[in-house]
A protein has these predicted regions:
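Interhelical loop and helix-boundary elements at the membrane-water interface
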Residues: 10-22, 40-41, 56-220
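Hydrophobic, membrane-inserted alpha-helices
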Residues: 25-33
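Transmembrane helix interruption/hinge and helix-loop junction motifs
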Residues: 35-43, 232
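A generic, well-ordered mixed alpha/beta core segment in the N-terminal half of proteins
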Residues: 47-58
Length: 232
């Protein structure tokens, strides 16, 4: 159903219909997640399948797709699959399932606080050539909001779930780090959209864009949290 909704969007990205890119990316991401879920597969085989799929799509279109687009799509697809698979790896680590919400909390909180801080206090542009509406004040507000939400998460875990795996001090630093990473992820996907001259990655969420528009920061934050929690 999601693919059908994506196919409705026929605008082009770099000369390639978005539905074609979404089709390749969806399959590639699914295969990547499948590899991480089933350790019997080998990464080299998965990469080869993704590359072959990308080239097959290019050949089918009679050379309309450039080699650089194939490589960008392939790399992006593997990154998306690997990032989302962080949730599977986190769950497999035995950590409390409540922590699976943390990548979303430390991404959406930063985005929300940054929006309102920028709306009320924003004066100095953060990256005008990439995202003209983002401001330094908004960025600082997002980081502060992330720290507050991270501390609130620790309090909730201590109060209702028998204790937190991470203390208040380390969580403050972790939330600050994730806030920076979330903003880098947001700007990175904004840069890609500007590069290809598109406004949104899809229409799944109507006016709010597609999956990547809503979860761009999560893709960057989830692997960071996975790495941090692997040392706990």
């Amino acid at each position: 159903r999601q693919r059908q909704m994506c196919i409705r969007d026929r605008r082009c990205v770099g000369g390639v219909k978005r539905s074609e890119l979404v089709s390749v990316s969806t399959v590639a991401a699914a295969v990547t997640v499948g590899w991480i879920y089933d350790r019997d597969h080998h990464l080299s085989v998965i990469i080869m399948l993704v590359v072959l799929l990308a080239f097959f799509s290019a050949i089918e279109k009679g050379g309309e797709v450039k080699f650089s687009q194939i490589m960008a799509g392939t790399g992006g697809s593997l990154f998306i699959g690997w990032s989302f698979a962080s949730f599977l790896r986190l769950e497999a680590s035995g950590i409390h399932r409540a922590y699976l919400l943390l990548p979303f909390i430390l991404s959406f909180a930063c985005d929300t606080f940054a929006f309102f801080a920028g709306l009320t206090l924003g004066k100095h542009k953060l990256a005008p050539k990439v995202s003209p509406k983002k401001t330094i004040e908004g960025s600082a507000g997002g980081l502060l909001g992330n720290v507050l939400c991270g501390l609130l998460f620790v309090w909730v875990m201590d109060r209702f779930f028998g204790g937190s795996a991470i203390g208040y001090g380390p969580m403050a630093l972790l939330a600050l780090l994730c806030g920076v990473v979330a903003q880098v992820g947001d700007l990175s996907f904004s840069l890609i959209k500007r590069e290809f001259g598109i406004k949104d990655y899809g229409r799944l969420f109507l006016a709010h864009g597609g999956v990547l528009d809503r979860f761009d920061s999560v893709l960057f934050v989830a692997p960071v949290l996975e790495i941090i929690f692997s040392f706990l």
